[in-house]
């Protein structure tokens, strides 16, 4: 009798697809390129009106349990929203607050900490950030200079995504005589905290330099467990950001295809030229591979499966490469016009570059991936 292996379905449900359609319609109206450019060219660090609208839609509480004011849908629904937010280039602190700060509280927070912050997050009344980096080098337990002692934390964190607009920060710091890493909650509106905006390639995602000088801090999670918690947190965020990147890459491909079909040269659509065809085909293949890896990551995240570390790293690497390729080739297909400020091509190029760095570069995640694969094979 022939062996019939069990089928695995990574597709989203009908309700989740309806959520995608609802989100796409809402963001098409509320996060147009005109709105994105308003943040890019203006002084506001994010679109506060859009942020309030997302709160009213219930998106901010998608993965937050009902007892803490959330909708308690789950991470698959959050992945659906992330893809649409990436497609629309939504200029909000969603990633820092939902993928990082809220997830940190859900993973390690006490009931009191969750009750203090999660309802505010779900309502859109609080913004969070994750303060891990201490400069351009890769943060490790051995090179942490930020220190925590006696309920106080001191050090410099830079760059911190949405650190200039956050109400609280989840800070990675060395603690105790042994200097083991721990996570700490810091009210960044309190004393001992100085924040300075940091310019990046994509001003629609604000960053800051945060100086902590004996700032009040409370432990998040068990003492000395900060590094394993940070790794878990980054894995979860990597899957969600991968969906943003896939959404952005698809938007860049759609933009390139539409232009190629509407632009004529020598009496023909430029989409009929082999060089353009191959660029579009390569973009499509890269995006579909990245999407498949992101779907696998979504499954692992929703189940908190043992495969999550490998699935997250795979999704991260594929999405970084696909989005950068799509954003770059979109500019090339547009020709000289693609390099101008007036065309929207550079908006995706900026976002592709930034999302490719904000959780650590694709190169770092490749190193993580091979390390994890080798550990699994041992």
Where in the sequence are the language-model features?
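Alpha-helical interface subdomain recognition
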Residues: 2-89, 108-113, 120, 124-125, ...
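Short beta-strand-to-turn element immediately C-terminal to the catalytic PLP-Schiff-base lysine
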Residues: 106-109, 171-174, 185-188, 211-214, ...
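A generic local secondary-structure boundary/capping motif
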Residues: 117-119, 135-136, 145-146, 157-161, ...
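A short, Trp-centered hydrophobic/proline-enriched beta-strand micro-motif
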Residues: 124-134
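A short core secondary-structure module
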Residues: 131, 156-193
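Flexible, small-/acidic-enriched active-site or ligand-binding loops
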Residues: 139, 143-145, 159-160, 188-222
């Amino acid at each position: 009798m022939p062996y019939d292996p069990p089928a695995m379905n990574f597709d989203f449900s009908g309700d989740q697809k309806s959520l995608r359609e609802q989100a796409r319609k809402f963001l098409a109206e509320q996060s147009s390129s005109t709105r994105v450019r308003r943040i890019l060219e203006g002084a506001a660090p994010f679109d506060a009106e859009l942020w309030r609208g997302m709160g009213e839609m219930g998106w901010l509480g998608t993965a937050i349990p009902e007892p803490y004011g959330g909708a308690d849908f789950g991470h698959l629904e959050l992945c659906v929203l992330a893809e649409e937010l990436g497609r629309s280039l939504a200029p909000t602190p969603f990633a820092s607050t939902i993928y990082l700060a809220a997830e940190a509280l859900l993973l390690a927070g006490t009931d009191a900490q969750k009750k203090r912050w999660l309802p505010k997050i779900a309502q859109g009344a609080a913004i969070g950030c994750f303060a891990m980096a201490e400069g351009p080098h890769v943060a490790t337990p051995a090179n942490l200079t930020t220190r925590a002692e006696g309920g106080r934390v001191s050090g410099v964190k830079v760059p911190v995504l949405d650190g200039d607009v956050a109400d609280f920060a989840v800070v990675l710091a060395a603690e105790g005589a042994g200097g083991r890493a721990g996570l700490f909650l810091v009210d960044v509106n309190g004393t001992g905290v100085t924040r300075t905006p940091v310019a990046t390639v994509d001003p629609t995602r604000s960053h800051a330099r945060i100086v902590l000088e004996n700032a009040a801090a409370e432990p998040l999670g068990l003492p000395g467990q900060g590094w394993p918690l940070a790794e878990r947190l980054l894995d979860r965020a990597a899957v969600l950001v991968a969906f943003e990147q896939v959404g952005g890459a698809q938007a860049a491909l759609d933009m390139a295809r539409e232009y190629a079909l509407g632009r004529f040269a020598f009496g023909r659509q430029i989409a009929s030229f082999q060089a353009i065809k191959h660029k579009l085909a390569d973009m499509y293949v890269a995006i579909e591979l990245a999407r498949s890896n992101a779907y696998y990551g979504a499954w692992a995240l929703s189940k908190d499966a043992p495969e999550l570390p490998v699935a997250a790293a795979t999704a991260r690497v594929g999405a970084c490469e696909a989005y950068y390729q799509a954003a770059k080739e979109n500019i090339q297909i547009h020709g000289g016009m693609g390099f101008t400020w007036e065309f929207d091509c550079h908006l995706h190029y900026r976002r592709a570059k930034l999302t490719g760095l904000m959780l650590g570069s694709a190169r770092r995640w490749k190193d993580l991936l091979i390390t994890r694969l080798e550990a699994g094979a041992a």
